[in-house]
Each structure stands twice: as C-alpha cells, then as structure tokens.
Amino acid sequence: MTINEIQDNVIEEFSAFDDWMDKYSLLIDLGNSLPALDERYKTESNLIEGCQSRVWLQADYVDGKIIFQGESDAVIVKGIVSLIIIVLSGHTPQEILDADLYFIEKIGLKEHLSPTRSNGLVAMVKQMHLYAVAFRAKEM
C-alpha cells in the first residue's frame, strides 16, 4: 500500500467516531497494539527531543525500506507513535520525504492535542524525515 492509501484508511477508521473521547480510545488501542520496543533501543540517541513524554524511535534500513519501531511512556502518545509508524514504516526514504501527511489534519489530531503533545508530534515526524534523509544518502 502507498502512504496515501494508508492515510486514507486511517482517516476512514477515525471518521467512524464523532466523539473525540472515542478517538482517544482508538489511539490508546493503537498504542497498546504497538510491539514493545527492545530495551537496547531505549537510548538517549533514540529519544525524541521536544516531546513532553519520553518517546523513543528506532529506524532500520531493510531492503531499501525504512522500518520504524517506537515506544512512549504515555498511553495517548504511544498511540500517536503507533499511528505515525503505521503510515510511514515500510516505505522507501524518498516516499517518506515526498509524503504529505494530510491525515493528521483530516482526523483533527493536531487540534485535539495539547501544545506540548502537538510539538511532540511535529518532533516525531521531523525525526522520521531525518532518518529518511540519512538512509537516502546511503543509497547514493
């Protein structure tokens, strides 16, 4: 699936709920379904700066695609991590760099987050882009 197809699926899944409490429950469920990050990846270098909660993001380059893993110590943030990983993991560096992450706006995520969580979301996406830039440079 393309990044846009995945985003469209996410939008459809979130649009099934009118109430943001239900959407938060969906985020929590997504976070609970995120595989635990191996302790060896919970390092300072994998810690995302700009997040109020502790968020770790690990990226591996496998067969030309970036595989992301992540975790957070906060349940809603862990759901956000899971959501971003669902959309971007398993794609090439160029696909990630070219992606317009419109689902964030369409599901209303950014406007329903506190300013610090919103900043954390931006920091997570920025870090994923930095990984994509680094892995793309290795391709050349």
Please tell me what each predicted stretch does.
Residues 7-15, 60-72, 79, 98:
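Mobile acidic interaction elements
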Residues 75, 91, 116:
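Residue-level signal for short amphipathic helical patches enriched in basic/charged
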Residues 90-107:
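Glycine-rich phosphate/pyrophosphate-binding loops
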